């Protein structure tokens, strides 16, 4: 897994630099040297890319550690419930390392904008991985990140319109925090991340860092339907066109639900799932002490043109 690869990288750097594991690699202990490959330098003078290196005490090439492990645990207290199929898979360190690939995530705009994006991302992913039907009804909206693989998929998610570009050689059911689905999504995401996910989609369900990276790929990038990225919407970087305004599409959390579900939860049939997303979001906004903003619902929004590129399906 890539998380362990980072640890190996740190050890290899020690060998290449001709130092022992007890010899400082960076900082004042090493002549104010910085770490290669943009790694963080810890207070002890060692290079790495986890919280221990990049947050408290970090001396150079540090990361934004506003969203702490404690917050992660408070948001997702039941993810390691014994009944959860994904028990032990999702960790704060894996999330933290994955965000390195997307420096704009949670780092765009003022503090409230950053908080709002974090709340929105974890709300949408909590609904996608909800273990409500497994754990039970206690402690409302604490069921997120219980699932890694889609429960009882009713399709192999091979889109005939894109199979010439992205041949279907496996099953492309939902995996990871945003339950990545469809052959084209695995193909495009794999190309972006330098991974052969079309042949090996199971990597999204076996490598925690890659799993978060795949979710963030969908979140951070605009889509071929003409839909903006979720990141652009929630940070205020997207402004609706005249066509968007006529279609009822407005900036806000509801627009994210429209994008992620391709409008599937903006109808009467999807009302319960849409409300779940909103309730997760309100809980997380309260935890982060930020106003959720306007336009939480997508009821009156038209979907973007369906050319087979956005077909994310929510869970109960």
From Swiss-Prot:
CDD domains: chitinase_GH19, ChtBD1. Disulfide bonds join 26-41, 35-47, 40-54, 58-62, 84-146, 158-168, 266-298. Gene3D superfamilies: 1.10.530.10, Endochitinase, domain 2 (3.30.20.10), Endochitinase-like (3.30.60.10). InterPro entries: Chitin-bd_1, Chitin-binding_1_CS, Endochitinase-like_sf, Glyco_hydro_19, Glyco_hydro_19_cat, Lysozyme-like_dom_sf. Residues 1-23 form the signal peptide. GO terms for biological process: cell wall macromolecule catabolic process; chitin catabolic process; defense response to fungus; polysaccharide catabolic process. It catalyses: Random endo-hydrolysis of N-acetyl-beta-D-glucosaminide (1->4)-beta-linkages in chitin and chitodextrins. Its EC number is 3.2.1.14. Defense against chitin-containing fungal pathogens. PANTHER family: BASIC ENDOCHITINASE B (PTHR22595:SF171), CHITINASE-RELATED (PTHR22595). This is Endochitinase WIN8. It comes from Populus trichocarpa. The gene is WIN8.
């Amino acid at each position: 897994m890539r998380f362990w690869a980072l640890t190996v990288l740190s050890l290899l750097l020690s060998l290449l630099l001709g130092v022992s594991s007890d010899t400082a690699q960076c900082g004042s202990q090493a002549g104010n040297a910085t770490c290669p490959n943009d790694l963080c330098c810890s207070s002890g003078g060692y290079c790495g890319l986890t919280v221990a290196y990049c947050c408290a005490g970090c001396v150079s090439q540090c990361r934004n550690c506003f969203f702490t492990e404690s917050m992660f645990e408070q948001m997702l207290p039941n993810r390691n419930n014994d009944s959860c199929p994904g028990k032990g898979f999702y960790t704060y360190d894996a999330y933290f390392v994955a965000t390195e690939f997307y420096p704009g995530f949670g780092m765009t705009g003022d503090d409230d904008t950053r908080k709002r994006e974090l709340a929105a991302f974890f709300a949408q992913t909590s609904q996608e991985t909800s273990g409500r039907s497994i754990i039970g009804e206690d402690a409302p909206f604490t069921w997120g990140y219980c699932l890694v693989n889609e429960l009882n998929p009713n399709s192999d998610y091979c889109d005939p319109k894109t199979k010439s570009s992205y041949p279907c050689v496996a099953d492309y059911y939902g995996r990871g925090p945003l339950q990545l689905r469809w052959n084209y999504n695995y193909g495009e995401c794999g190309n972006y991340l330098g991974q052969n996910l079309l042949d090996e989609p199971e990597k999204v369900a076996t490598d925690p860092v890659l799993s978060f990276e795949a979710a963030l790929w969908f979140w951070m990038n605009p889509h071929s339907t003409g839909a903006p990225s979720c990141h652009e919407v929630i940070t205020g970087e997207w402004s609706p066109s005249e066509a968007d305004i006529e279609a009822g599409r407005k900036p806000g959390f509801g627009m994210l639900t429209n994008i992620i579900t391709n409008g599937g939860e903006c109808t009467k049939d999807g009302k319960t799932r849409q409300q779940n997303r909103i309730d997760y979001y309100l809980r997380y906004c309260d935890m982060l002490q930020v106003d959720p903003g306007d336009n939480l619902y997508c009821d009156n929004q038209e979907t973007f043109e369906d050319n087979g590129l956005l077909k994310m399906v929510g869970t109960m």
